[in-house]
Amino acid sequence: MRTENEYKGSNPTTSKMDQSQTSAFFEVQGKVKDFSYAGSVGMTRAWFKESEEDHAYYTFTPTVRLSYNLKKAGFLRYRFNISPAIPSLGSLTDVEQAMDTIQIVRGNPLLKTYQQFTNSLSYSYSKKQFNANLSVRHQYYDNPIMESIFVEDGKLILKDENQRSFQSLNTELMAGINGATLFGLKDFLTLYASGGYTRSWSEGLNYSHMYDEFYYSVMAQVQYKG
């Protein structure tokens, strides 16, 4: 695949890039009584070339899924996976683009791919029309690509760089009833409510941020069949 980008301005530039990607994948799964398991692994090679410079990225993508049937007490599920993030063609381009009189977006051919690690654990329970689910998820990005902003020769430079890390922790609870009979009307009401909390940490090359978020939602639906 080939992409061609033309940047116009005081210094017009044409950037041409070639790209190819090759992947292989393998999966195995099984079950022992109430315990189920599955595992998969993939390997991907991504290649980019601009002018005389080329970059090759190799990514490893394993996934593990486990589940246990607690029968009347519900289901317990666990999932772990590693997924790669490859720099975009636009970020790799060795080009400066003026956004206005003071802001310049600068490409970075030295960007490296990074890994995203995700662990998730969930418990679900249902009885008749009642359903509930509790989940916990943790994500960790190792040397993620995030924007750096700095001043150079009186200009504000915006540049993607591999930073130190990013991680988030999320907990969410959902509960509701589906098709409940109300006022003698069968399957009249469906009601669900959910709420959660997320904490995120960003560790840059010369900065750090922490962000907390609480959220909730309520969904109600009534249905009448004459």
Give residue ranges: language-model regions.
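Transmembrane beta-strands of outer-membrane beta-barrel pores
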Residues: 2, 32-34, 43-49, 56, ...
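Outer-membrane beta-barrel translocator domains and adjoining extracellular loop/strand segments
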Residues: 2-13, 49-57, 89-97, 102-104, ...
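Outer-membrane beta-barrel signature, preferentially recognizing the C-terminal barrel domain
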Residues: 17, 84-133, 140, 158-174, ...
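Surface-exposed extracellular loop regions of Gram-negative outer-membrane beta-barrel proteins
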Residues: 17-53, 57-67, 188-197, 216-226
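Membrane-embedded beta-strand positions in outer-membrane beta-barrel channels/transporters
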Residues: 21-27, 61-63, 77, 108, ...
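Repeated loop/turn-to-beta-strand initiation elements of outer-membrane beta-barrel proteins
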Residues: 34-39, 72-76, 129-132, 181-191, ...
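A short, compositionally biased micro-patch
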Residues: 69-71, 114
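Outer membrane beta-barrel strand-and-loop segments of large Gram-negative receptors
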Residues: 112, 131-223
